[in-house]
Amino acid sequence: MNLNINLLLFLIFCNINFSQNSMNLDILQGIKNPNLVGDTIKLEKNTFNAFNKMQIAAKNDGVDLKIASAHRGYDRQKLIWNTKFKKFTTEFKLKPSQAVYEIIRFSTIPGTSRHHWGTEIDIIDSNYPDEEDVLISKKFEKDGIFFKVKNWLNINSEKFGFYITYNNDPKRKGFEHEPWHYSYAPISKKMLSLFLKSDLKKVIKKEEIKGSEYFTDNFIEKYKKEYILDINKDLK
């Protein structure tokens, strides 16, 4: 009798553990939402609280931080990916394989975006509400409209746990430098560690993702090494 009870408890534990792991992977891949807070801009709760503190500190220094983009689910990332794929292959007449590499200069394959985690934010200056195409690198450089914000973040963001994800280290490969993209390290480092346990091939080799037939084993290995892992060393 005791053996049966112990076996039952073991099976229940295994089932709960499996369900939790599955849920975690679904969150990391953007299929399910993490514990998000916020109105129109949603973030993981610790990230949300840390950003609010940073925003107040910046305001006290005369700098107005605004989040241009935060959490992004799988379906949204898939729409971005497929729209770009269609544009590059029809308007710009790129070969499908070329389109894939053009997209991953700045955009991730659905299921692999750090924005799925709710720990990533794209930051701009709130004083330019009518500005279009805000996520342009030159706008964050000297004489650019977001230089004031960028300069403040360079000095202060790490005090609040935010690190630029794709920095301008000349030795770094993968995604282009994004001066607007910051990650809340205390949570995102844990998220990355969990994400690396997933089967990347199963995550991205889906018919609904345009161009996925070009995701060969060599491509997937390169994507993992250079795009997922070649980030700011302080986020590993």
Regions found by a protein language model. Give the residues of each.
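Bacterial Sec-dependent N-terminal signal peptides
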Residues: 1-26
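Extracytoplasmic cell-surface/polysaccharide-interacting catalytic and binding patches
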Residues: 17-236
